[in-house]
Regions:
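N-terminal subdomain of lithium-sensitive/metallo-dependent phosphomonoesterases centered on the IMPase/IPPase/PAP
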Residues: 1-88, 160, 255
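Residue-level signal for inorganic ion chemistry
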Residues: 17, 21, 52, 91, ...
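Short secondary-structure boundary/capping segments
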Residues: 53, 73-76, 119, 137-140, ...
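Residue-level structural signal for beta-strand termini and adjacent loop
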Residues: 67, 98, 120, 132-133, ...
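DPxDG-like acidic metal-binding loop motif
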Residues: 75-132
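Short helix-loop capping/hinge motifs at secondary-structure junctions, enriched
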Residues: 113, 134-138, 241-245
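An extended, acidic
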Residues: 141-255
Length: 255
């Protein structure tokens, strides 16, 4: 097994789970959104768990859909390799007809760092991964930066930050879709505070870092994964040249 194998596996599994979810979405329809969300979560989780158990038998897995007992398994904390997956990021958007801002996340953490990851955006027909990291868009001098925020619960402080730095807010669905939007040039930054978990950001952060983007907590400290408490409540991902201004603005707001 080579390092490249992990990049390939992450990309393949995310894309395959995404295709399965597209088929399920088309077959089931949108008449019962809650049932569609539950079925999608479960089907993708089972697929990823079985695939990783077959392909990477000795590795641990942390999944959003794992039971509390599985999440608390102490073997994960001493493992050298842990896959961190979100089988369906953006269940709300997945169950809304016409929306494409949902994703599948597959990331690998090794000995303290994210080493591989992929974000499938099935309804948009693309997968971003560390196998072939996207080239970051060029800066737009003199143009107001755009900050991706939650479409359902945008943090109040991000609205204050946008006013302070002269930015526009762009509502987007899932965390994976928002970070992907930074990497593809739809926005220049994503700022969030108020509650997330490791599986919400591990894969897109792996891709962002491989692309050369900035990714940190909103106080500038590193994002850390495979912790005993998987809560990771805030995040900043941006084009590298914009990060100092955003971090300074956040510090000013929190004085």
């Amino acid at each position: 097994m080579t390092i490249r194998d992990d990049h390939v596996l992450a990309a393949d599994l995310a894309a395959e789970a995404g295709e399965m979810l597209l088929t399920l979405r088309e077959k089931t329809g949108f008449a019962d959104p809650s049932a569609l969300r539950a079925e999608g979560d479960t089907a993708s989780h089972l697929f990823l768990m079985e695939a990783l158990a077959t392909s990477r038998k000795g590795d641990s897995v942390l999944s959003e859909e794992a039971t509390q007992q599985e999440r608390l398994d102490p073997r994960r904390l001493t493992a050298e390799r842990v896959w961190i997956v979100d089988p369906l990021d953006g269940t709300r958007e997945f169950a809304e007809e016409g929306r494409d801002d949902w994703a599948v996340h597959v990331a690998l953490w090794e000995r303290g760092a994210l080493t591989a990851g992929a974000v499938a955006l099935p309804a948009g027909g693309r997968t971003l991964s560390t196998l072939d990291p996207p080239v970051l868009p060029a800066p737009r001098p003199g143009v107001r930066p755009r900050i991706a925020v939650s479409r359902t619960r945008p943090p109040g402080f991000v609205q204050d930050l946008a006013r302070l730095v002269g930015a526009d807010l762009v509502p987007i669905g899932s965390a994976g879709a928002k970070i992907s939007a930074v990497l593809t040039g739809e926005v220049e930054a994503y700022v969030h505070a108020g509650g997330q978990y490791e599986w919400d950001s591990a894969a897109p952060v792996a891709v962002a870092l491989a692309s050369g983007a900035h990714a940190s907590r909103i106080d500038g400290s590193p994002l850390t994964y495979n912790q005993s408490d998987p809560s990771l409540p805030d995040i900043l991902v941006s084009l590298p040249g914009l990060a100092p201004m955003l971090l300074a603005g956040i510090r000013d707001l929190h004085r």
